[in-house]
Curated annotation (Swiss-Prot):
InterPro entries: 3-oxo-5-alpha-steroid_4-DH (IPR016636), 3-oxo-5_a-steroid_4-DH_C (IPR001104), SRD5A/TECR (IPR039357). GO terms for cellular component: endoplasmic reticulum; endoplasmic reticulum membrane. It comes from the Eukaryota. Converts testosterone into 5-alpha-dihydrotestosterone and progesterone or corticosterone into their corresponding 5-alpha-3-oxosteroids. It plays a central role in sexual differentiation and androgen physiology. This is 3-oxo-5-alpha-steroid 4-dehydrogenase 1.
Amino acid sequence: MELDELCLLDALVYLEGFLAFVAFVGLQMVGSSYGRYSSQWSGRRVPARPAWFLQELPSMAWPLYECIRPAAARLGNLPNRVLLAMFLIHYVQRTLVFPVLIRGGKPTLLFTFVLAFLFCTLNGYLQSRYLSQFAVYAEDWVTHPCFLTGFALWLVGMVINIHSDHILRNLRKPGETGYKIPRGGLFEYVSSANYFGELVEWCGFALASWSLQGVVFALFTLCALFTRARQHHQWYLEKFEDYPKTRKILIPFLL
């Protein structure tokens, strides 16, 4: 039974890698379908807050489920517990905190919501089951330079992501409408500082977990967020004549 599930998890790694390619190509061709771009698309919609809560929920529920299961064989080891906690903490914030803080978010297309829900279900299962049942680490892995560097990147990335979201939420004063140029933090260097933070976060997780499961998640994040970030960057350049020309798309000073 365990061998069958391990084969399934291996297959899901390849599937997620394929989905990363599909996301990259698909978003290049048709662009993003949420937020400021949603009005360009027709179809049924889901209000922003419940959409965010429900689509992120599987990635919070899977690790919580593994934590309460007595049969979670590998969670007796400290590295496995810490890595699963890193994954869980992110999705607690995205599921329970982020939706509450949304200010006037535009409804999400039902199609986009369903795709996000399915991905969070797949990836939540993949990361949680691998770390709780199959990942083998030495007890002192938490002191290894790869883990420590990865953990530091994960933490810094999460802080950047949360701080950048805070800047975006507070661009408009009460009663104001329309769009503004983000200022402050890493927005002085890139157009999508929030995406950069999330990318750093999952690259750190991949390094700390030292696993293909972590790497393919970071790869999917890069493929999905880079195309969105480039669309944001182009939109800002077209919308604002005074938009800083020195800002990069996603990675400060590079890209």
